[in-house]
Amino acid sequence: SGLDTSKNDYAWTDLTYLLHKANVSWAYYLSEGNQPDCADDAMLCQAKSQSQKVPGIWNPLPAFDTVKQDNQLANIQTVDKYFTAAKNGTLPAVSWITPDNPVSEHPPAKISTGQAYVTSLINAVMQGPDWDSTAIFLSWDDWGGFYDHVVPPKVDEIGYGLRVPGLVISPYA
């Protein structure tokens, strides 16, 4: 289930490659441990070991050719390093953080647990020395859910499409 590592890796250009080529620092923060890694649309599945170097549903980057070829695997770090970097003012120019299952807001996880986790991530930056020059782009990977309980209005045969929430948080927003 999950990412099939027996097939060829991803050979297309990704954002990390473009950042690397432009000499823009980046990091991808994740939680280690055992996480559900469901194939397709399965609701339940066995947990798989997740780590910085192991591709999986929460960490696709080790499967990208450019991440390996450009020696960027070290940019994939555990989330505890995010909190340390935020406190010390040493976050890279671009950071991504992916949750683990208990804080992902995916069923059966509690939404309040996910919201508390996101709040801790944001507060870490706000309380750090880089807050004055930081913008946080918060988005979710799914549409629907509890935040959007009404179908978008029908304007034509195509429609607006499904809505995915996004927030920009900064001293200037």
Question: How should these model regions be labeled?
Answer:
Residues 1-173:
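N-terminal pro-sequences and low-complexity stem/linker regions of secreted or lumenal proteins
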